[in-house]
Regions:
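Conserved N-terminal phosphate-binding loop of PLP-dependent enzymes in the Aspartate aminotransferase
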Residues: 1-200
Length: 200
C-alpha cells in the first residue's frame, strides 16, 4: 500500500512505535543521539521525549542530553546539529506536517541531510497517516522515509499502531536477525488482543 514500507511491526499505541523506530535507528547506526522537531507537540510518553519537556521529574538528566531539537521549516537548525554532533546522530524524527505545510522542499532537505550524514530519516505519521493521503503524507508530499510510524486513523480509533519501513532497517528488530544481538522492540500485556487489527 505504501511505497516506502517493506516490513511492518504492530503495537498498541503511538509511543511504543515511535520509540521502537528510535531503537532501530540507534541499533542500526551504533549512535546515541536523536534529533526531534521541537515544533511538533508530542511523540511519546517515553523518557527520550518526556525528558526533553518541562515534565522531567523522575527522568534522569542523561536522557534529556541525548535528545536534540531542531525547528520545522528551518533546515539550518538541523544542519547545525549535524555540524555540532558529527557522526553521532542516529536518526531524525518529525511529523510531515501539522499546522504548516513543509516549505521549500523541507522534508526532502531533511531526508537528504540525514542520508549525507548516515542517519535515519523517520516520519511520524500518527496524525497524517491515512488522512493526508491513503498512502500517508509521505506520498502526498512525495518524500520517502527510512522508517515511519502510524496509528489513530489507521483503525478509526481502535488501539493499534505500527512502525514500518525499509527491510534493511526493520530487520534489526526482526525475529530472524542473525549475526547480531536482536533489538527488543515491542511487547505488551494486551498484544494478543486482535480487535484493533481487525479494525485495520
Amino acid at each position: 500500500l505504501i511505497p516506502s514500507v517493506e516490513m511492518v511491526k504492530f503495537a498498541k499505541n503511538g509511543s511504543t512505535v515511535t520509540t521502537a523506530a528510535l531503537k532501530i535507528a540507534r541499533a542500526y547506526t551504533g549512535r546515541k543521539y536523536i534529533a526531534r522537531c521541537y515544533d511538533h507537540p508530542f511523540f511519546s510518553y517515553d523518557d527520550w521525549f518526556i525528558g526533553d519537556t518541562p515534565l522531567t521529574r523522575g527522568i534522569p538528566e542523561e536522557y534529556h542530553s541525548l535528545t536534540l531539537n531542531f525547528r520545522y521549516n528551518d533546515i539550518a537548525s538541523l544542519q547545525q546539529l549535524f555540524d555540532q554532533y558529527p557522526d553521532q546522530i542516529a536518526g531524525v524524527i518529525l511529523e510531515p506536517a501539522t499546522g504548516s505545510h513543509p516549505e521549500n522542499n523541507f522534508l526532502h532537505q531533511v531526508r537528504d541531510l540525514c542520508h549525507r550524514n548516515r542517519a535515519l530519516f523517520i516520519l511520524d505519521e500518527m496524525i497524517t497517516g491515512f488522512r493526508w493521503h491513503l498512502q500517508g503524507a509521505q506520498t502526498y508530499y512525495n518524500v520517502e522515509p527510512d522508517l515511519c510510524t502510524f496509528g489513530k486513523g489507521m483503525a478509526n480509533g481502535f488501539s493499534v499502531a505500527a512502525v514500518a519501513g525499509k527491510r534493511e532497517y526493520m530487520n534489526v528488530g526482526g525475529i530472524k536477525e542473525s549475526g547480531a544481538e536482536r533489538v527488543f522492540l515491542t511487547s505488551t500485556t494486551h498484544g494478543a488482543e486482535m480487535c484493533g487489527m481487525g479494525a485495520f
